[in-house]
Swiss-Prot record:
Residues binding Fe cation, per UniProt: H246, D248, H428
Pfam families on file: TauD
Gene Ontology CC terms: mitochondrion
Compartments, as annotated in UniProt: Mitochondrion
Swiss-Prot/TrEMBL cofactor(s): Fe(2+); L-ascorbate
Top-level taxon in the UniProt lineage: Eukaryota
GO biological process: carnitine biosynthetic process; mitochondrion organization
Name listed for the protein in its UniProt record: Probable oxidoreductase AIM17
Presequence positions on this chain: 1-16
Disruption phenotype: Increases frequency of mitochondrial genome loss.
Other comments on record: Present with 5800 molecules/cell in log phase SD medium.
InterPro entries assigned: AlphaKG_dependent_hydroxylases, TauD-like_sf, TauD/TfdA-like
EC number: 1.14.11.-
Amino acid sequence: MLRSNLCRGSRILARLTTTPRTYTSAATAAAANRGHIIKTYFNRDSTTITFSMEESSKPVSVCFNNVFLRDASHSAKLVTTGELYHNEKLTAPQDIQISEDGKSLVVKWKDGGHHQFPLQFFIDYKGSSFVSPATRKQESRYRPQLWNKRILKDNVKDLLSVSYNEFIDPKDDSKLFQTLVNLQKFGIAFISGTPSSSSEGLTIQKICERIGPIRSTVHGEGTFDVNASQATSVNAHYANKDLPLHTDLPFLENVPGFQILQSLPATEGEDPNTRPMNYFVDAFYATRNVRESDFEAYEALQIVPVNYIYENGDKRYYQSKPLIEHHDINEDNTLLGNYEALIKCINYSPPYQAPFTFGIYDKPSDLNNNLDLNLITTPAKLTERFLFKSFIRGLNLFESHINDFNNQFRLQLPENCCVIFNNRRILHANSLTSSNQQWLKGCYFDSDTFKSKLKFLEEKFPHDK
């Protein structure tokens, strides 16, 4: 994609301040150590590299666009992609030299710029894999593990093994890494032993900022309270009745990726038995069940828009989203066994749902016998009813699954315990009533924050599984 000269400053700054990193698997790196560059030739438009990836493997050749090679370089002669497109001197090589050991080659351009490309670069970009290097940089090496109650309980020992002091220790990131890996795999993690003097939200703020900055929302600029004894219309959590399973803030275009809830100490005289029950469900597991049971209904869940609304005080938010959103399709994630690589996020929140505007019209069954009916619905809107019926069928399958006790992880969150969960994957609910005196403290942070910290720690702990 061509970028304008407006990006020149940021592009140059990035190259001056960023150390290039290689994002490769151990197997791929080992292949590079055993392979070598054999030959190369170039013209004004392209450069062809012939190399082997193993000592005894058959050599392969890849022809690269010269604009790509110059743009991917870290030459001291800094230019924008747009400049490369319009100036052949910046892209056509003047000379190319293969190193004596065959592990790299140096490209020299006509403007005096030069860059040494390691063999690993050409292996990464060889194009024989469905996963591009850019995708590999984004993806974690840990794949989501879809779960029901039994599967999660089998892993609960690891999920509950992180204490607050271990998590918050700035000299040791191992427990932070363990927590983020659990979030990546299961969408949920717990931290025990949080300090009891937390009414101001300082503890949960420290927990969040260990991962990244707190996300401001309609609930406040930092942390927020969840307490049924103080009902208010600001947050649907506060209603004095059990909430259905849902994701938070679906009426925002950029929905917060993760939520943290901390259980605070009991009030004086509180009966521990009245503490609310918390429910968690893996919505990805539920949507996979729909896909396997009724593919036509599953497709409708990807298409039919569900409307969400939030009106309170001076705030007016409105969004329309399908229940299911996918990642871009590739050769890998379309396989039935790799569904966890296909599903991106879930939009499901009955507390904030507005009336449908798609598929709401039907065709009168006796229209032919009532020709005088002045039916004003357009034919295009009438045809939506077929897809909407499939949507309702899929929604029924989805809700039957998430409301099945065997698919729910239920617990009374202990005092001074914290739960972190993926707000785009894990549905949650609680049984707060007017008799419950427990306070929950909450906050949000973004998915980008989580992904950034997880990738950094994966680099720091490359051998952890």
